[in-house]
Amino acid sequence: MTDDYAAIITRVVPSTRPLPGPLAGRTLLVKDLIDVVGVRTTYGSRIYADHVPTRTAPAVQRLLDAGAVLVGKANLPEFAWNVTGQNPWYGTAVNPLHPGRTTGGSSSGNAAALAADLCDLGLGTDTGCSIRLPSACCGTVGLKPSWGSVSIEGVFPLVPTLDTVGPMARSVADVALMWSVLTDKPAPAPRLAGRTVGLLTRPPTVGDGSAPPESLAAEEWIGSLEDLGARVVPATIPEPEANTWPLFFHEAARSHAATFPARADEYSDNVRTKLELAQKVDPGEVAAAYRALERWRRYEPDVDLYVSPCIGIDLPPEDCDELEVRVAFSAFLRPFNLLGWAGLAIGNLQLVAPRDEVVLAAGLALESG
């Protein structure tokens, strides 16, 4: 591995003989937020610098049992709570596709490694954007599965109501194969014919009153979608009736209760600032956020799936202030974690639907042409 890519992989694991199976011999990089027995797993933090898990996360075990070969753990920002991939403790993964620009976060090491051809497959996590955003930044493919479809056991929690584990690769076909292994379901056949696709040029907010960016970037895909038999229509998605950020901060504070504020000095300034804010969230606002989310998740779309860009702003530089760009940078992605829907990133294209099979079928159709 060259020095340029040294911060992508936090540690290399000696190769083992692969088991037979659909992933036989495919090299796998696991985000360092996910436990692997006997392999130091830091969660991107200084606090857990010497942590060695005594169990392997079920999602990882499924991939290994299918023949994947674990070759290392992928770098990430501290506790996966950063959308630009910056990590003051272990270095920041570079973007092989756009040098000098952010890799996105928080599954930054996975996406960068895939873009640099350092592995075949990646296993990441996504709470607000963290598989799809790095995939878009690095020109790779990543699936945020619908909430609950893949086990999150053995993963350090951020916001359990939103946390997901999902596959990353360089092709939709490989992502679909990994998804099949992770869920024990057959991968869907390619399909766009007869589907109604809603074109999103502005995402819904998460109820916080912000003005999300407008982007026409996904319009370049209209011709391809229509050529494959889809009907593309303008679309919008209603917004939750209350601000949902208090829910996010409330659960994040709970996830860190064992170490914050007791060990606050061992956190980076970035995450410490967020956790200090989380301590001040009003309980009434938290309750209102849960009620709003419950009602919002009942929304039934009037299209089969949506298409949007993953990123609605220019790609920030790698040394940007994460706190300044995080809301606009992830605006097209975060709402779908709250809704619990599946989101597939193919470079900067995002396909979204309530069901994993629908976005995978559409992505496979686009990939096969």
Placement of each model-derived feature along the sequence:
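Glycine/serine-rich anion-binding loops at beta->alpha junctions
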Residues: 78, 98-119, 127-132
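Structural helix-boundary/capping segments
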Residues: 2-4, 65, 115-203, 219-224, ...
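General beta-strand structural signal in soluble alpha/beta enzymes
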Residues: 30, 70-75, 123-125, 233-234, ...
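Short helix-loop capping/hinge segments that flank enzyme active sites or metal/cofactor-binding pockets
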Residues: 26-43, 247-292, 344-348
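Glycine-rich, small-residue loops and helix-cap segments
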Residues: 65, 119, 182, 284-369
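Short pre-catalytic strand/loop immediately N-terminal to key active-site residues, enriched for Gly-Thr
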Residues: 46-54, 91-106
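Acyltransferase
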Residues: 213-235, 257-262, 285-303
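Short, well-ordered alpha-helical
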Residues: 1-52, 56-57, 77-82, 315
